[in-house]
UniProtKB/Swiss-Prot annotation:
Pfam family, one: Chalcone_2
Domain of life: Eukaryota
Stated name of the protein: Altered inheritance of mitochondria protein 18, mitochondrial
Annotated localization: Mitochondrion
Extent of the signal sequence: none
Species classification: Eukaryota, Fungi, Dikarya, Ascomycota, Saccharomycotina
Organism of this sequence: Candida glabrata (strain ATCC 2001 / BCRC 20586 / JCM 3761 / NBRC 0622 / NRRL Y-65 / CBS 138) (Yeast)
Keywords from the named record: Mitochondrion, Transit peptide
Amino acid sequence: MLRTLVRRSLIKNTGLATRATRLSAVTKRLQSSAPKPATEKSDKKAWWIVGLVSAAFAGGTYVCTWEREELQKERDGKSVLVDDAVTPFPVVISRPTYPLSTKYDILGSGIRSVSVLTFKAYALGIYIARQDKPKVAQVFDSTFMSKNFIDMDENKSHAENVKIALDDPEKSRILIDNLLDSNIRMVAKLTPIKNASAKLLKEGIIKNVQMHPDASKNKETLAMGIKEVEEAIKIKGPVPKDDDFLMELLADGSLKFSYYNRRKDIVNELGTVHQPLVGKYLFAQYLSGSNPVSPGTKDQCAETLASLV
């Protein structure tokens, strides 16, 4: 008891509690709770966890942080372990596993966490169409982009300057907006680490779109797109952990939704949003700005994009 009190005092007064220590503590507490017979108390705890994960999907309620996971590494070059609670993300996705229009290669992956308890909500992967990779260089190598936003340091290579620009909150907005305007195709893959709610998953996507800095300038147009999102995501009820929710940004700017039920091994094609601002704003929130959905995912994507110029 005394040792515990002393340790708490040291942590409080000297700031020795590192983020890694807090992460370990939370993880151990969650993993130590073995399955027990259902009781009113345990049911309330379960629903509290589901609600917390759903709140993270909704976005904006909590400040989200990223911890670069030691677990995150390639397995035989075919998949990336984002978190040990979910199936590793394949580095290449295509048919027949998912109902996609073409073959996609991973740009980056990471975790969305709730900073209040450093609580992991879901794993996120961003993919780029293999056929569209040359568009990255076409956009970032243009004279206009190079002269005005990218190649500011003559002592650095073009690729290094691209990475610096993509790390800048303001410049990254400009670079990614221009990239998305090139009709580039991408996929966002969301995999819950804990059981989540379909309703709040949908609300989270909508909120991320609405948080784009240009959303207020296009309220009427965006409102029509938001209505399409509500109609397109047809799943209801819980979204079990380790299921996959995919959003494919097509060349015409439309956004196609699909859902993979891992337990049943069934893929459901959902609806499509045709208003291009929805897909553009959503992927811009993943890849740019000062408060991206998952900072770690954004950073990895920036590194990969810089390597393509």
